[in-house]
Regions:
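FNR-like FAD-binding dehydrogenase module
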Residues: 1-417
Length: 417
């Protein structure tokens, strides 16, 4: 059974396929002399508009707000579909991929027009167009799941710097075409101009909130950093904040842990790679943040009457704000090594205070549990409507797949970025 992410990818692919078929037939975009490059450029722009806007923080929060506003008395089958809103990344990857494929057609049209002298294409347009194609292909290749996982830092750099470069070159390309096609028509009378304005604003807005803020770090062990922030932002439960020590190169998002009736928030950062390892070891007193708190998978608990949380390691962090808020009755199973020793007695006691019935499984004492079996039993005993898993990729996929195989609504991160 295909996950919603892949269904969205297929949907956008089919829509583009239909447009391509119509272009081949009734719309007559392709003939022996030329290709309708202006119409194709509009299709390209529409695809990239969707790809960029669907990743904009305000758009993401709006999507989650709409999806989680469904009343809890609505039928479960409707609510479980709405809760899959976090699969919106399928729109991003599909429209970006389709936009790149269409750009190949556009480049073909440019070179065909150059040889036939149909649109009076000049060398600057050819150079800019070729550069854009090279950048797009690089971005798409680095975003392939295996490439992204193996070369994540390089993926991030090509996605960010390459994406900015493409946007700038789109502006240059548009101005060159305007000068070639209709120099007397003001820019503001052209749809492409306004689309590029929107896309540029979408990219710039998060960076307008870039700031370096003070932090306090408590490390109960060399495996974790309990990081506190209080710089005037109190995020909502189920959101994340992006952190960086080098804003141009890499960003890492972590689930916010706000507490009711308190300002600021906390993050639970565990040693899971070079960046987090260095962060925990060096304990910086300042860090870069940008944009706004952005909704994530945990917030979908709002559409259910009862939820069962499954967490491993620092996965307790994303669960904790929901447990503290207690808007949705829930129960937690947390599997981790030596909880008090690793995360500190204060955090463990905080969880126990809000979740007296929480199942805290010490893997150092009892070994790794069969979380699927434990989750299913606890789900039935608690009479929950859904399971939310916060863990590593393989375990999250295992729990979500096995729960859904049993007909149980299940949710967890999908590692699409």
């Amino acid at each position: 059974m295909l996950i919603p992410y892949k269904r969205l990818f297929i949907l956008i692919t089919l829509i583009n396929g239909i447009v391509f078929f119509k272009g081949l037939t009734s719309w007559n975009w392709f003939n022996s002399e030329s290709i309708a490059i202006y119409k194709i450029s509009r299709v390209i722009l529409f695809n990239f508009t969707l790809a960029i806007l669907i990743r904009q923080q305000y758009v993401i929060n709006l999507l989650f707000t709409i999806a989680t506003s469904v009343p809890k008395h609505w039928p479960l089958f409707i609510r479980r579909i709405c809760a899959k809103v976090y699969h919106f990344g399928g729109l991003h990857s599909s429209s970006a991929t389709m936009g790149t494929l269409w750009y190949f057609v556009f480049v073909w049209g440019i070179y065909k027009s150059l040889s036939n002298n149909v649109y009076q294409i000049n060398n600057p347009i050819v150079i800019i167009t070729t550069l854009i194609l090279a950048l797009l292909v690089t971005i798409v290749i680095m975003a392939l799941p295996k490439m992204r996982a193996k070369y994540h830092n390089q993926f991030e750099i090509t996605h960010r710097i390459g994406g900015w470069s493409v946007l700038i070159l789109f502006w240059v390309q548009m101005l060159l075409f305007v000068r070639l096609e209709s120099p007397s028509i003001p820019l503001w009378n052209k749809l492409d101009f306004w689309i590029l304005i929107v896309l540029t604003a979408s990219v710039i807005i998060p960076w307008l909130r870039l700031k370096k803020v003070g932090i306090n770090i408590d490390s109960p062990s060399n495996h974790v950093a309990l990081t506190s922030f209080d710089y005037g932002v109190t995020p909502f439960a189920g959101s994340s904040t992006a952190l960086s020590r080098n804003p141009l190169l890499e960003w890492h998002s972590f689930a916010n842990v706000p507490a009711p009736d308190k300002t600021g928030f906390r993050l639970t950062i565990s040693r899971a790679g070079d960046w987090t390892g260095k962060f925990i070891s060096e304990k910086p007193n300042k860090i870069w943040v940008k944009g706004i708190p952005t909704a994530g998978v945990g917030i979908v608990d709002k559409v259910f009457k009862k939820v069962f949380w499954v967490a491993t390691g620092c996965g307790n962090g994303p669960c904790l704000p929901h447990l503290l808020l207690n808007e949705t009755p829930s129960i937690l199973i947390w599997s981790t090594r030596s909880p008090e020793k690793t995360y500190g007695e204060a955090l463990v006691n905080e969880i126990k205070n809000v979740q007296p019935n929480a199942i805290i499984w010490n893997t150092d004492e009892h070994g790794k549990p069969d979380l699927v079996k434990l989750a299913y039993k606890a789900y039935k005993d608690f009479n929950a409507e859904a399971v939310i898993c916060i863990s590593n990729q393989s375990l999250t996929q295992k729990v979500v797949h096995n729960m859904e195989y049993r007909g149980i609504p299940a949710y967890g991160a999908i590692w699409d970025s």
